[in-house]
């Protein structure tokens, strides 16, 4: 209970006009294989009874600070793209253990073979870590406790997997799931259908549209949404009726406008379809933010959307 988990991004920092800037929050979407070499190096050099490093996918990893503090705050690195990070680096005495690790990691990574090779290939080097988004183990009911349902989670993002584990969901690993544009969309849809043969519920998460928006690429975001529509939604909807009665709920977990390149707090549009769904309650002609606003249906608080999915009504 005293352990604190920090999200650890591999990032690219650069000097711009004398300021240290966040050039790339993903270190050029470094491959998982390359990233694991760097995280293994961190663990070998700095891992001990107090700090432990865990490799994830691409640039997303974890550091556990045993008996550590959870009140040292750094903003999400994707909110700092192109900006100076100088004013966001904590300088309190309490933050020194984290800053010491960050500085040591920069020295360690400088001549690491992974980064030497990436620079030779014209790619962004993972020349620093960024520790943020910390928290302690959550206390939460499982899906079985709350709804008496069995379930699974499918995602390339360890944060989503972790929440799923605490919710009592089985983690389904899909080969080729990268959390980026090149992820295995169709494989995720197929894995969801297979999981539903022996479970009541599947949470299927795709990170690609969010990543594209954080990168400020409208072209990439459109591609990600189109592939999600065709290869995830299309794959699931083509065969789900063969499993019997069903309900499908589709929605983003938050908006990430390309123009802002970060998350906003606006309500998200959702669509619910399947057995026992009242299609006249708030029918819309299309799936979009504009159509959702016109429907007049707002689910508040947002977590009540699960009641709508499971029970077919808001409770």
Protein language model features and the residues they cover:
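Feature captures the catalytic ectodomains and active-site-proximal regions of enzymes
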Residues: 1-315
């Amino acid at each position: 209970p005293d352990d604190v988990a920090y999200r650890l991004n591999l990032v690219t920092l650069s000097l711009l006009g004398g300021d240290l800037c966040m050039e790339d929050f993903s270190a050029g979407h470094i491959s998982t294989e390359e990233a694991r070499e760097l995280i293994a190096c961190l663990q070998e050099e700095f891992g001990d009874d107090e700090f432990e490093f865990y490799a994830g996918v691409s640039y997303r990893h974890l550091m556990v600070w045993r008996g550590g503090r959870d009140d040292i705050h750094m903003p999400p690195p994707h909110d700092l793209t192109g900006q100076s990070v100088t004013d966001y680096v904590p300088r309190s005495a309490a933050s020194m253990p984290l800053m010491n690790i960050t500085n040591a990691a920069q020295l360690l990574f400088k001549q690491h073979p992974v980064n030497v090779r990436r620079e030779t290939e014209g790619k962004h080097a993972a020349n620093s870590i960024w520790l943020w988004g910390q928290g302690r183990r959550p206390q939460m009911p499982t899906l079985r406790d709350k709804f008496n349902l069995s379930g699974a989670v499918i995602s390339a993002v360890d944060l989503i997997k972790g929440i799923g584990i605490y919710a009592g969901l089985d983690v389904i690993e899909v080969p080729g799931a990268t959390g980026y544009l090149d992820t295995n969309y169709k494989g995720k849809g197929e894995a969801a259908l297979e999981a539903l043969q022996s479970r009541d519920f599947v949470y299927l998460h795709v990170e690609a549209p969010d990543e594209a928006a954080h990168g400020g690429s409208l072209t990439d975001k459109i591609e990600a949404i189109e592939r999600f529509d065709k290869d995830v939604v299309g794959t699931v909807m083509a065969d789900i009726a063969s499993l019997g009665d069903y309900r499908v709920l589709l929605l983003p977990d938050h908006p990430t406008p390309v123009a802002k390149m970060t998350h906003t707090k606006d309500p998200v549009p959702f669509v619910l379809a399947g057995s026992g769904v009242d299609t006249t309650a708030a029918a819309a002609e299309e799936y979009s933010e504009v159509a959702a606003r016109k429907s007049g249906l707002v689910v508040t608080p947002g977590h009540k959307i699960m009641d709508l999915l499971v029970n077919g009504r808001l409770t």
